[in-house]
Structures are given as structure tokens and as C-alpha cells.
Amino acid sequence: MSLARILLVLALAAAPAGAQEGQFLSEAEAPHAVFPDADSVSRSAFEVTPALRDAVSARLEGTRASVWESQWIVFRAQHGTELLGHAVVVEEIGKHRPITFVVGLRPDGRVADVAVMAYREPYGGEIRSARFLSQYHDKGPADAVRPYRDIRNVAGATLSVEAASRAVKKAQALAAVLGLTS
């Protein structure tokens, strides 16, 4: 085998398995990713005041979710006059960097769908798969979403799986505090 070929094989072996990082949904696409039947969406931005931060944090007690954003974006999704729910954009830290999620919540607070908007880690991007994210469908605010127990883990993506679970709980807590869910 030639030296060039050996160097190429070594370089490929040392390279990351694939591009995990990226922006996958724009803010405009996000509500339609979790509510594909929506024919109208309206956007609201909520500045994170100390009172709002404390109220959301109180609902998250025991979940290890972080409340560090300066604002939260929430979309009201409708089909005709029917309220489908709210799409809540939240971020949670993966291993080193934030992962941006959009969590679709039905009016009763149960998860309609979850999507990854932006993934900034070199590994663990498999959590973007529909197979993984479908585990959150129909989970309510009182339902546990613990990796290895309630949610199947993704090999090599444990911290990203934990971030997804925290993001779902954070979105549910925020929606409840804002009075968007029952």
C-alpha cells in the first residue's frame, strides 16, 4: 500500500463520523415542523424577567433543566379556528453547547411533536431522528421522560438525550406558567 493511501486511511479514521452540527429549521419553519396541519401561526416573544424565570424554575424543580435564555419564542398554531397548540422554542446544553429545540404542545399540555432546530455538538446528532423524538409524543407535564427508563437512549448521545428531555419539560413548564395549557 502506498504512503499516500495509508495517510488517507488514517485521516479518514481520525475524522468525525459525519456532520452532526447544523441549523436544521429556521424560526419560521419551526412551528410547522411540530404542527404540520397548521394553516396559521402567530409569534410571541416573552422576555425572561426574574419573576418568569423563578416561576418556570419552580415548576422544573428536580429536572436539572436550565433557565438561562433571555427570551422565549412561542408560536400559536391554528387550523382554521381550531387551536392545535403552541410551539415553544427552548435551548438546553448538550455536552458543551446549546441545542435548540421546538416543542409542540397541545392545549392539554401533552407533546404533539419535538424537532431539533439547531445542533452544535460534533457528536450525538442522532437525536434528530424521528424514531428517537417520537418517544416524546403524548407525554404530559406529569409524565417522566428519564433517559434509560422512560426514553430509550441513543448510544454516544447520552447528554444530548438528557438535553432533549429537559427541553420538553422546560417547554411544558413555560407553557403552564404563561397559561397556554390546561
Which residues does each PLM region occupy?
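Flexible, solvent-exposed loop/hinge segments and secondary-structure transition points
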Residues: A19-V154, T158, E162, R166-S182
